Amino acid sequence: MTRVKRGNVARKRRKQVLNLASGFRGSSSRLFRTAQQQTMKALSYSYRDRQQKKREFCGLWVTRLNAAARLYGLNYTNFRHNLKKAGIQLNRKVLSQVALRDKQAFEQLILLVKD
């Protein structure tokens, strides 16, 4: 059986893992085995939190819309239902930005919806 020399491949792999772990604290950024474990954990956390971020922002938009609609005597569910009946197709993100940044435009939306 022939001898397999993998020094370059192994070094490249270890260097790649240690580069990914460069911002970690303590031995997690210096020792290969702990760095490998921590990078796997960090990558799984980052994947999970990218999904969670979407849910949290959606909840934030709903909360903002509910607060803004209550100033005009509506709640979020009635506001959304009346928007749908009026044929206004704006998503939660855009509606919350309008409510936050442009009070007059949001008030016009409320007047359209209330009638």
From Swiss-Prot:
Keywords, comma-separated and alphabetical: Chloroplast, Plastid, Ribonucleoprotein, Ribosomal protein, RNA-binding, rRNA-binding
GO cellular component: chloroplast; ribonucleoprotein complex; ribosome
Subcellular location: Plastid, Chloroplast
Gene Ontology BP annotations: ribosomal large subunit assembly; translation
Molecular function in Gene Ontology: rRNA binding; structural constituent of ribosome
Organism superkingdom: Eukaryota
Keyword Electron transport: no
Function: Binds directly to 23S ribosomal RNA and is necessary for the in vitro assembly process of the 50S ribosomal subunit. It is not involved in the protein synthesizing functions of that subunit.
PANTHER family with a match to the protein in the record: 39S RIBOSOMAL PROTEIN L20
Annotated family: Belongs to the bacterial ribosomal protein bL20 family.
Protein name in UniProt: Large ribosomal subunit protein bL20c
Organism: Chlorella vulgaris (Green alga)
